[in-house]
């Protein structure tokens, strides 16, 4: 039945409505008026609006008052605010084309329209850092300082000026005068086909968010939990941040949740969410600066099941760049509601900066010259109303807070040690002095975390902190006993050897404990990568001709136990990526019996003839010509294995044995 004409009662229309433009379908709004026939047939007449034209003004570029902007109805991003006009058009033109009718889902998917990118939180309205990034050019910085000084003087001489107009700031006006380039229709179509603007169904996304705050956030609390949940529930959360959260949390959700999101395994899910976040970032679909910083930090703690140029090093450098540009270090000095969040963010970056350098001294310290800030305390966490968010947030425990504080202290200890061993004239006495606080630090953890007898009451935070400390002690002592820093002191090498073996023993004990308690799947990526580093150290000891037969035999036994631990988490992307290389090395050196099920895991690494059968306990000895590891990773399979500096070669960090903190 033809629709009655409404053209007589509406203004003349000469273009398609926003939903039809987004879907690239024919629109009859010019004939029948609004809503058009397509929107009526899809039962979404409220979404049928025209995109706003940018009006020309005679004087100034911000003729619109804040009051008039507030009166503009929220039509899924079709009517752009001045702040939104500087954002990529793909975000602002996306309509909610989801077939779901759940109001919660409509709210969540409203973030596709660009409302998620408005930087209008109370914490970022009234100041440039961290709410607004600093200007990139010197003359703009000088002008900005001049404007700020003049504004401050005028404010002191008159009534306090309201901060409800962030668009009137000098920095915002610069963005209006020099808007970033807009994406064209081809880019929009490409991103839409990649489903960058889509999220899992709300009931599954809720599980993902909860898993993130239960298993990821406690070890890197870089979000304000209640602010995030409010923006997520209202549909105004940055998509880049949501995809990053989903990528990190995909390791901890149940298999049913993965299936509900359309993924068969964790590797596929994590790679998909990671790719969407990466595309969102690469196409400059910018969210607010804080969300982009937080998302980059989350992606910096993710290891995929395949090598990527955008690895943890890339995202860490990107995080430091964004934090410096936002002036987060200055925000840590203020005394307001946002100070706690920015102090935690800055300390997490500070810890990672030291650990990155400690892992490989070829890395440069990015924050070495940053001004010192006051150490974290338990008061640096927000007070939360848990009754309102009890379904998705768990209370923050004493152990969680102490965990991050302890990590900061640990980073300081190892930072002091590295400053000595990398100096021009390191001495054994000075190294002993700098490492001494480590033992007292470990002893104090149980009491500080208020640990109970039950494993669930904070024990995972205790074990994760201990694991990190023993891991980096192993790295340091290994390098000392191998003469990495040209230390000729024989007594120092013997001391390093003893501490190295003790740390290895403690790591073995911790790994066995989490296996017995069946909690290895609940521990963070930093713990998982420690297991791969531990296995590499055991392999090195087992094949080291300089070691005694007892040490080599014990190392072989430890290889078996560590492989059992990895087998429990072999569906984790980081482990799926590392296992094939480990299995080839172990098989070649007859350190680990491989069964038929094991050989299936390395089918992409070697070719097994069809007439060759393997029974349990049989050692697979593939010919070298069948190995197809990347060229950079093949050198350790041949020749003198001990001559290869297994944990130091930079190309081996493709496997991330020790490459993530």
Curated annotation (Swiss-Prot):
Disruption phenotype: Substantially reduces production of fusaric acid. Residues 56-132, 151-184 are annotated as: Disordered. This is Fusaric acid cluster transcription factor FUB12. Residues 17-48 bind DNA. GO terms for biological process: DNA-templated transcription. GO terms for cellular component: nucleus. It comes from Gibberella moniliformis (strain M3125 / FGSC 7600). SUPFAM superfamilies: Zn2/Cys6 DNA-binding domain. Residues 73-98, 110-119 have a biased composition (Polar residues). InterPro entries: Amide_Lactam_Regulators, Transcription_factor_dom_fun, Zn2-C6_fun-type_DNA-bd_sf, Zn2Cys6_DnaBD. Its main location: nucleus. Fusaric acid is phytotoxic to plants such as cotton and banana. It has been shown to induce programmed cell death in plants. In addition to a mild toxicity to animals, fusaric acid exhibits acanthamoebicidal, antioomycete, and antimycobacterial activities. It comes from the Eukaryota. It is found in: Nucleus.
